């Protein structure tokens, strides 16, 4: 859309090496049918991540990194996204669990979807080998996907401690993650401490600080 095009034009002034394309999970809205009955409708934002990524890559010749989520996606829906990205020769991904739904107190997968990013990594690894979620196989002719994952210098809100976060980050790296991008942090010291802790734990991939420009105070 117009807003996204304007953002890309501004970003080009800084000669970015890549642009991350966020993904929004599907959400459910309830329509009042009267007589105490409600109809649940599943909605997903449009245009989708694949369309936005393809438009940016083709129009501006900038590498794009679409986000692939557990939240709001079944295994089959994830496979469709991977097939579309492969067809478009978009092979760099950021693999995330994603947020819980607005009405949830704890994270719940969509259908047969995944609880953890490491499970999503396994599906992508199998896809790179030509193995679909139903067990059927295809001949691999395209470049395989490479991907990064998330990490949390100030601890994930659901983690008991930073050691637990480091444990799972190491598992994600062992499963194939080539780098990690941090969640937003508000104390630079926490980032540098986390990088040193990761090295001490045997995590040797690049850890990139996640930075989000704020336009207004309420975004904090």
What are the residue ranges of the model-derived segments?
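Catalytic cores of alpha/beta
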Residues: 74-86, 164-167, 193-196, 216-219
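Active-site/ligand-binding-proximal alpha/beta "capping" segment
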Residues: 136-174, 178
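Glycine-rich, proline-tolerant flexible connector loops at the mouths of alpha/beta enzymes
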Residues: 10-47, 101-111, 177-193
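Alpha-helix-loop-beta-strand connector modules within alpha/beta enzyme cores
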Residues: 33-66, 112-149, 192-211
